[in-house]
């Protein structure tokens, strides 16, 4: 079936006229009720067979279609800070409006459910007299949020929240993007810790740990430049971690606040002081992770935009990209309207204001984050000394993120390898004959300004496999480690991970007389329920029932019908492999030492049978 070019233009005018909800209002059924999953426009029917340009029996119509898209789908200014371009032009605006309508409709049930469960939870907490101790935070979760967060919070996250091992291993699971190993000669020690303290904790010196490649660092000191909202407070923590030579565990060594008296805390301090230090650190880390994750939106977006402008809707590569970029262009404008707007959900819950969050995103992009190939998992982790060349230090004894990511990535790469091989007949030379593909690579390196994209011409199928694998990993893997259901289930679980602090950073140690004294820094029952409710709305509990999980990533009927038997066979293998991964993750328990993957909590953030295949929030 030939793409209807007139239909594309008509769709642009139609979708552009769709009402867009304000605040939490959800778009009604004015949006189309069914949307082809492999078309750049809601009114573009998918071809019955996808073809490469040199095999298309109607090349002139194909060229005209691309010309129409290039004229109406344009690179507009970045939204939500200064990162990559955002769609503009008649067709670009139409796609944005369509995706926003889709997103708002998908979010409706989750939002209604989370609000209902929030009210029920608050009533239950108040019936117990409120949050009077740290352990009372269990009331936030016990028996609640069963519809909006059906998997519940990660096992061990509440029962072991005081554990130093839990705190340190969060850097290798909940947020693996802020940690680096300090190079013994290229990196200086970021701050000092008393020799006798280091000796007592590690049986060696700080310099020796550094020289041996056993010292790791997280730096949130740049958050110091932002002013917290009235009545809220924030540190700007730096943290040192190490691989212990005796226990072979990854453990915390020290936390420096960088504000006020600029105290440095260690595990040898009073247990309540040290727990407060970990809470302050996690508050900074939650801010970091929620804004860093936006790069997992912007990077695939700009590559997809370049593809829309250069590939025909009949091209099999664009068909796959359109599938995995489902509703992708909703997030930035919706975020601006209801999350990062003045007084919006961010300001209602976080310590630092939304203006700081958006500035932070712009800042990390301006300083080089968001490179395409630099974001490949192996490249990213190697650069930070976490895998591969470990700067002469020992390998991490456990790295849960990497362990699970390797498996999910392997399944995605296996599918993409089979897809590319079947599309190009196992012939690298066929890439050169695909002038649309080569135009895409040139466009990405040119007008789209994609950072660190493979250069034109693309000569090897393996390069294309890498590109497609990375985009699919961003939408179905990396994003969900930091966002989606991960914050409500792990990285935002109270009391260890408050979105804001409600008392000043201490000017001296000994400020916390008892564990219950920590409540002064933590949200009360109302703000606690609001935090959980917001994070619950990030989750997408319905995708499993709707067959929209990572396991279904490539299973769109149009793709199965239009790409032939080899594609269908590759999809079947992918479904089988991701099923095995999911069963293993869901079957995890604690070993005889009370650990799972070396951690005192069970991490499930990369479960392909739970996560959406798309950029959900």
Swiss-Prot record:
EC number: 1.13.11.-, 1.13.11.45, 1.13.11.58
Highest taxon listed in the record's lineage: Eukaryota
Cofactor(s) it depends on: Mn(2+)
Cited function: Lipoxygenase that metabolizes linoleic and alpha-linolenic acids to 9S-, 11- and 13R-hydroperoxy fatty acids. At the end of lipoxygenation, the intermediate products 11S-HPODE and 13R-HPODE from linoleic acid are then transformed into 9S-HPODE as the final product. The intermediate product 11R-HPOTrE from alpha-linolenic acid is transformed into 9S-HPOTrE and 13R-HPOTrE as the final products. 9S-HPOTrE is further oxidized by the enzyme to 9,16-DiHOTrE as the end product. Also acts on gamma-linolenic acid producing 9-HOTrE(n-6) as the main metabolite.
GO CC annotation, single: extracellular region
Domain Lipoxygenase intervals: 122-617
Binding site for Mn(2+): 293, 297, 479, 483, 617
Alphabetical UniProt keywords: Dioxygenase, Glycoprotein, Manganese, Metal-binding, Oxidoreductase, Secreted, Signal
Glycosylation sites (chain numbering): 109, 119, 160, 547
Gene Ontology MF: a single term: linoleate 9S-lipoxygenase activity
Protein name (Swiss-Prot/TrEMBL): Manganese lipoxygenase
Skewed-composition ranges (Low complexity): 23-48
Annotated family: Belongs to the lipoxygenase family. Manganese lipoxygenase subfamily.
Spans annotated as Disordered: 23-59
Position of the signal peptide: 1-17
Organism, as annotated: Nakataea oryzae (Rice stem rot fungus)
Cofactor comment text: Three His residues, the carboxyl oxygen of the C-terminal Ile or Val residue, and a fifth residue, usually Asn, ligate the metal, which binds water to form a catalytic base Mn(2+)OH(2) for hydrogen abstraction.
Disulfide bonds: none
Subcellular location: Secreted
Effect listed in the UniProt record for changing residue 350 to M: Changes the stereospecificity of the enzyme from 100% 9S-HPODE to 62% 13R- and 38% 9S-HPODE from the oxygenation of linoleic acid
InterPro entries per UniProt: LipOase, LipOase_C, LipOase_C_sf
GO BP annotation list: linoleic acid metabolic process; lipid oxidation
Swiss-Prot/TrEMBL catalytic activity: (9Z,12Z)-octadecadienoate + O2 = (9S)-hydroperoxy-(10E,12Z)-octadecadienoate; (9Z,12Z)-octadecadienoate + O2 = (11S)-hydroperoxy-(9Z,12Z)-octadecadienoate; (9Z,12Z)-octadecadienoate + O2 = (13R)-hydroperoxy-(9Z,11E)-octadecadienoate; (9Z,12Z,15Z)-octadecatrienoate + O2 = (9S)-hydroperoxy-(10E,12Z,15Z)-octadecatrienoate
PANTHER family: LIPOXYGENASE
């Amino acid at each position: 079936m030939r793409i209807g070019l007139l239909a594309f233009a008509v769709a642009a005018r139609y979708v552009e006229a769709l009402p867009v909800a304000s605040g939490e209002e959800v778009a009604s059924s004015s949006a189309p009720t069914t949307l082809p999953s492999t078309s750049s426009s809601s009114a573009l029917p998918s071809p019955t067979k996808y073809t490469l340009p040199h095999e298309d029996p109607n090349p002139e119509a194909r060229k005209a279609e691309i010309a129409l898209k290039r004229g109406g789908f344009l690179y507009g200014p970045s939204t939500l800070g200064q990162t990559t371009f955002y769609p503009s032009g008649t067709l670009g605006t139409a796609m944005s409006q369509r995706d926003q309508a889709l997103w708002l409709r998908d979010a409706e049930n989750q939002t209604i459910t989370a609000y209902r469960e929030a009210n029920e939870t608050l009533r239950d907490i108040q019936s117990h007299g409120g949050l009077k101790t740290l352990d009372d935070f269990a009331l936030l979760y016990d028996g609640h949020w069963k519809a909006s967060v059906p998997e519940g919070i990660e096992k061990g996250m509440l029962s072991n929240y005081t554990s130093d091992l839990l705190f340190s291993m969060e850097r290798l699971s909940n947020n693996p993007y802020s940690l680096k190993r300090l190079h013994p000669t290229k990196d200086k020690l970021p701050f000092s810790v008393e020799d006798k303290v280091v000796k007592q904790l590690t049986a060696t010196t700080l310099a020796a740990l550094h020289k041996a490649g056993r010292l790791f660092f997280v730096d949130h000191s740049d958050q110091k430049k932002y002013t917290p909202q009235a009545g809220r407070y924030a540190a700007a923590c730096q943290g040192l971690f190490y691989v212990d030579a005796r226990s072979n565990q990854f453990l915390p060594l020290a936390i420096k606040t960088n504000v006020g008296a600029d105290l440095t805390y260690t595990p040898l301090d009073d247990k309540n002081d040290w727990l407060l230090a970990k809470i302050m650190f996690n508050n900074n880390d939650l801010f970091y992770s929620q804004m860093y994750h936006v790069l997992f939106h912007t990077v695939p977006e700009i590559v997809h935009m370049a593809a829309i402008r250069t590939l025909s809707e009949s091209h099999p590569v664009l068909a796959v990209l359109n599938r995995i970029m489902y509703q992708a262009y909703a997030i930035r404008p919706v975020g601006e309207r209801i999350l990062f707007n003045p007084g919006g959900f961010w300001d209602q819950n976080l310590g630092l204001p939304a203006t700081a969050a958006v500035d932070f995103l712009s800042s990390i992009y301006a300083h080089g984050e968001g490179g395409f190939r630099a974001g490949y998992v192996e490249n990213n982790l190697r650069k930070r000394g976490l895998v591969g060349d470990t700067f002469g230090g020992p390998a991490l004894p456990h790295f849960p993120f990497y362990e699970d990511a390797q498996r999910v990535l392997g399944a995605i790469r296996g599918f993409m390898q089979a897809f590319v091989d079947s599309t190009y007949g196992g012939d690298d030379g066929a890439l050169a004959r695909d002038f649309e593909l080569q135009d895409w690579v040139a466009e990405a390196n040119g007008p789209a300004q994609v950072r660190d994209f493979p250069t034109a011409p693309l000569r090897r199928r393996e390069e294309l496999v890498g590109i497609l694998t990375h985009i699919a990993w961003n939408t179905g893997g990396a994003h969900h480690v930091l966002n989606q259901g991960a914050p409500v289930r792990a990285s935002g679980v109270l009391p260890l991970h408050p979105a804001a602090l409600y008392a000043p950073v201490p000017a001296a140690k000994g400020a916390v007389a008892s564990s219950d004294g920590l409540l002064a820094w933590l949200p009360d029952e109302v703000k606690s329920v609001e935090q959980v409710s917001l994070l619950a709305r990030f989750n997408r509990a319905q995708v499993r029932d709707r067959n929209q999980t990572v396991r279904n990533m490539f299973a769109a009927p149009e793709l199965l019908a239009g790409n032939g038997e080899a594609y269908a066979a590759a999809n079947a293998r992918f479904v089988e492999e991701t099923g095995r991964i999911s069963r293993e993750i869901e079957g995890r328990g604690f070993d005889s030492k009370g650990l799972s993957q070396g951690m005192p909590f069970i991490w499930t953030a990369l479960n392909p049978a739970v996560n959406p295949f798309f950029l959900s929030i």
